[in-house]
């Protein structure tokens, strides 16, 4: 009986991780749709734009300042940042909850981003700070097991 309970617990934890990674794939696909609109405004090269499609892959390094500028532009399209170019917690929470099963990810994602923002709060250049926050968020999402596989994003991208 005890081993059955452990099996049920492990299965529910695995389901939860898969569920949050699946929600993250929806968030990423939808958010990423605005990248082309923001490319010129942010000075993002076509090469980096193409690479961004693989944001969650191990091979993609989140280091380019222009990517931070693009993320700011993209976030502003959905009102996800305050005037001080920091995350708008309520809007981000609601944005994530707007996706299928988003409530399983919203609180964790807001917390991870906020913790990353605190680490780089002294960075005065908004684009540089945001790209550092994005890199931190990617690393922490992987650590938490909520980062989606690129194939998951590709599977849902047509919905947006």
UniProtKB/Swiss-Prot annotation:
The name this protein goes by in its record: General odorant-binding protein 2
Role according to the record: Present in the aqueous fluid surrounding olfactory sensory dendrites and are thought to aid in the capture and transport of hydrophobic odorants into and through this fluid.
InterPro entries for this protein: Odorant/phero-bd_Lep (IPR006072), PBP/GOBP (IPR006170), PBP_GOBP_sf (IPR036728)
SUPFAM superfamilies from the UniProt entry: Insect pheromone/odorant-binding proteins (SSF47565)
Organs and tissues of expression: Detected in antenna (at protein level). Expressed at high levels in antenna.
This protein's UniProt keywords: Disulfide bond, Olfaction, Sensory transduction, Signal, Transport
Subunit: Homodimer.
Coiled coil: none
Pfam families: PBP_GOBP (PF01395)
GO biological process, one term: sensory perception of smell
Family: Belongs to the PBP/GOBP family.
Source organism: Bombyx mori
Disulfide bridge map: 38-73, 69-127, 116-136
Signal peptide: 1-20
GO function terms (MF aspect): odorant binding
SMART domains: PhBP (SM00708)
């Amino acid at each position: 009986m005890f081993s059955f309970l452990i099996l049920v617990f492990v299965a529910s934890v695995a389901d939860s991780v898969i569920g949050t990674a699946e929600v993250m794939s929806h968030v990423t696909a939808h958010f990423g749709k605005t990248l082309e609109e923001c490319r010129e405004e942010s000075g993002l090269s076509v090469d980096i734009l193409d690479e961004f499609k693989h944001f969650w892959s191990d091979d993609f390094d989140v280091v380019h300042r222009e990517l931070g500028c693009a993320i700011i532009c993209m976030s502003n399209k959905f009102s996800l940042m305050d005037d001080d170019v920091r995350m708008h917690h309520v809007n981000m929470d609601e944005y994530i909850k707007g996706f299928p099963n988003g409530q399983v990810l919203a609180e964790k994602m807001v917390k991870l981003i906020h913790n990353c923002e605190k680490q780089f709060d002294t960075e005065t250049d908004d684009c540089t700070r945001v790209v550092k926050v994005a890199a931190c968020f990617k690393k922490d999402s992987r650590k938490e097991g909520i980062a989606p596989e690129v194939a998951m994003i590709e599977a849902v991208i047509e919905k947006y």
